[in-house]
Every structure is written in C-alpha cells, then in structure tokens.
Amino acid sequence: MPTSVVTGGAGFLGSHLCDYLLARGHRVICIDNLVTSSLTNLEHIDDDDFVFVNHDVTDPIEVAERVDFVYHFAALASPVDYLRMPLHSLKVGSYGTHHALGLAKFKRARFLLASTSEVYGDPQVHPQPETYWGHVNPVGPRGVYDEAKRYAEALTMAYHNQQGVNTGIVRIFNTYGPKMRSHDGRAIPNFIRQALANEPLTVYGDGSQTRSFCYVDDLVRGLVLLAESDEHLPVNLGNPGEFSILELARTVLKVTGSKSEIVFEALPVDDPQVRQPDITRARQLLDWEPEIELEEGLRRMLPSYGREPVGV
C-alpha cells in the first residue's frame, strides 16, 4: 500500500485529493493547520488508513513512517486569504515548500508541487503553454500569491537538479466543485451564493475577461496521473474551454433558476484579461483530457449548497 502525504489536505483541492487517493488504496497522511480550511471537508472519511495532523508547514515536517508521495497543496489560494495574510502566503510558498521538499528528499518520495496558472500573470501569450515565462507584477496586490508560487517552482527545480529529488510541478488552472467556501472570493462560489440568495451577481469590469474552468474530479484524476509519472517539468492541468465572466454569470443564473440581475463594478488591480491552458503536454504525457463541461459541473456542484439544479 503506497503512503501519500497531502499538505493542505483539509482545503478544497486537498480534501478531494485525499478522497481520491484513499479510493485508490493509498494510506493518506493529511497535514493542515486549518487557518483557511476546515475539518468539515474531511468529516465524512471513516478509514483506518487516513491520518490527520494539525501542523503548519512553515515549521519542519516530520513523519515517522515510510512515505511514497508528497503532494504539496498547502497555500493561501483564495484572494480573500492572501490579501488578508500576505506575509503568511509568502512564507507558505517559501518555508512550506522547502519543508515539504525536505520531507520528500529524506523519504526518497515522489514530490508534486501544486503550482498555479497565476505564474503566467496577465498573459501576453494565449493560450498559455508551459514554455511561457509569464507577465507578472511582483509588487502588485496579487504578487504575494503569484510570486510565492513562482519561487516554489524555482525551489522545486533546485531540489531536483542539485539534490536529485524526484519532483513534479502541476500548474493548476481555475478549478471548481463541491467544498468550495461560499465566501471564497472567486467567481463561481460568489455567483452561486449571490444567485441562491436572489442577490445581484457582481461582475468586475465589463465581464469580457475570460477564464477556463475545470471541474475538480477531472483535475484530481490528472494530478495523480502526473504524480505517478516521472515528468519533472511543469504541466498545465485545466479545462481549455474558455468563457467570459459574463457568460459564466449567465450560466449560473440558468442552472440555479435565479432571477437575480447582473451588476458591474470596477475591475481589481492586475486582474488578468485572459486565462486559458494549453494542455498539449498533459495530453501527450498523461493521456489526460477533462471530461466535464461547465454547465454539467455547476449542476454537480449545486447540491453542496443545499439546492438542486433546475432544468435537469
């Protein structure tokens, strides 16, 4: 039985990953300090092969038993969180990644860094391949997250090149699904919360900016495929289907049956105008392709908000 350590395992993505690994017969050690996550995401797990450890990864990580995989997902990924705790965001990206890599080195485990499409910033190349270096403002408000991930990637490559650690890097594009916090600060949970409360849906800017939304089940499947490969260069994982934020808002209204209106507010500083993954590398290396389209994913997500989708 393989043993996997998942840092940030009580968060949105991390908890889905824990579920998937347990279903595949892994022993899972979940490490989280619960600052931005919740044990509610794990309370359904009743498995002797699951262990939860309340620990901050900015402190050294110690695991007594054998470890085969280290999935480093600890991060302040929500704008609400990294804008409120900018220094902690940078520390998790630096100290936290260093400690997770140190664990993988000591245990001779395969390491997978959860990086992000935010390393591309406000891209001037579209769609974004892994070879694109990005267009990022390091001193803007988003820099505390973007640069934390860019540094984490550099640190991961340094451990691979100098220390021989078996590492992988996944650049995750906008992902959604059950267990997202309703006040997460990201478009999909914001729109669903507003629609179900019959409040106006807040679109920033004119809504023409685009994103590509990947359902969490598709993403997690790709994560494990990448972890089980020997690829050490970054790999994009995301759904290449591209939607404007205004299209997203209208789709949420359709799925929820809400009569809410759409209102427009000023675009935040450094908000990217476009975001779409080039997943050629994932297709070629992993034979991975997302399967769940946006409207279907939103319908699957709604019951977690206590509401059934309309028009089913």
Regions found by a protein language model. Give the residues of each.
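Acidic beta-to-alpha connecting loop that harbors the catalytic carboxylate
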Residues: 10, 117, 179, 207, ...
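N-terminal Rossmann-like NAD(P)+-binding domain of SDR-like oxidoreductases, especially those catalyzing
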Residues: 1-175, 217, 223, 292, ...
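C-terminal substrate-binding subdomain of Rossmann-fold SDR/epimerase-dehydratase oxidoreductases
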Residues: 17, 55, 99, 174, ...
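Short, surface-exposed alpha-helical segments at coil->helix boundaries
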Residues: 39-42, 153, 189, 246, ...
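Short, conserved glycine- and acidic-residue-centered signature motifs
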Residues: 93, 148, 184-185, 275
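A glycine/serine/threonine-rich, flexible loop-to-helix segment
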Residues: 126-127, 182-190
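Short, solvent-exposed loop/turn segments at secondary-structure boundaries
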Residues: 84-85, 179-184
